[in-house]
Regions:
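Hydrophobic helical membrane-anchoring modules
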Residues: 1-9, 154-156, 180-251
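Donor nucleotide-sugar binding loop of glycosyltransferases
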Residues: 18-21, 49, 78, 104
Length: 251
């Protein structure tokens, strides 16, 4: 448990067409945080879903409370959804958690423990940590490893994985970094971590347990998405190392 029981934990959960699992993930997140004795708020962001995601969020509010709903009428991407949710956050610590239950919210506790023990500012889950347990398609693992190598070449981050959907930040880190962020979709995580590292914040990785739940090996990542991720990644490099855009934007 946190050594500061008064600390508030904000969990931001962006969701796009997650009607089949969003209620269960909200329930599990609230249960985990309640059992651990934390003060918390859960902020769920409906990112323009076309299924029953919003209705399931509203059902959770009616039955559980401790929940804020943000409804984006148009699908703007994960990055846009998280930034929108952050505007509603008031926690001392902020968790990003994917809504699909591939990563059980019970792992939040480990991220908080590591942040306290190692006295860092950011903790990220890592699929490439040697202690991680993965039930993950081989082709997705292959792509993830290639992307991680490219990131290391371009940015020399002290991380093996930037894209896993569970992360913990001190509030002040995001307050400083978010004004600089331009990516709205999959490279959003990378852009945050690159800027946090550039500003001198300490980052640690933790092993995760991942159970890939989608029926298709590709999941939702299409060739178009991968191409967009590549373009955005190069754009981050360009802004960081060529134009020094991020240094010109006040935090």
């Amino acid at each position: 448990m946190s050594d500061k029981p008064h600390e508030l934990i904000s969990v931001i959960m962006p969701a796009y067409n997650e009607g089949s699992c969003i209620y269960e993930n909200i329930y599990e997140t609230i249960r985990v945080l309640s059992d651990a004795g934390y003060r918390y708020e859960v902020i769920v962001v409906n990112d323009g879903s076309t299924d029953n995601t919003l209705e399931e969020m509203e059902r959770a509010v009616n039955e559980m409370g401790c929940l804020k709903i943000v409804n984006c009428r148009v699908n703007g991407g994960k990055g846009h959804a998280v930034k929108t949710g952050f505007r509603k956050a008031s926690g001392d610590l902020v968790v990003f958690l994917d809504a699909d239950l591939d990563l059980h919210p019970g792992q939040i506790q480990n991220l908080i423990n590591i942040l306290k023990e190692k006295r860092v500012d950011v903790v990220t889950g890592s699929k490439r940590h040697p202690q991680s347990q993965l039930n993950y398609p081989l082709f997705r693992t292959f792509l993830s490893n290639i992307y991680a190598f490219i990131i290391w070449i371009l940015f020399r981050l002290p991380l093996r994985d930037t894209q896993t959907g569970i992360k913990l930040f001190k509030y002040e880190v995001l307050k400083k970094v978010f004004p600089k962020i331009l990516c709205k979709k999959y490279a959003f995580d990378l852009e945050i971590l690159v800027n946090a590292h550039h500003l001198g914040y300490k980052i640690a990785e933790v092993p995760i347990v991942l159970h890939f739940r989608r029926p298709m090996n590709w999941g939702r990542i299409s060739l178009v998405d991968m191409s967009a991720l590549g373009v955005d990644t190069l754009a981050i490099f360009y802004r960081m190392h060529i134009t020094h855009y991020y240094d010109k934007i006040a935090s």
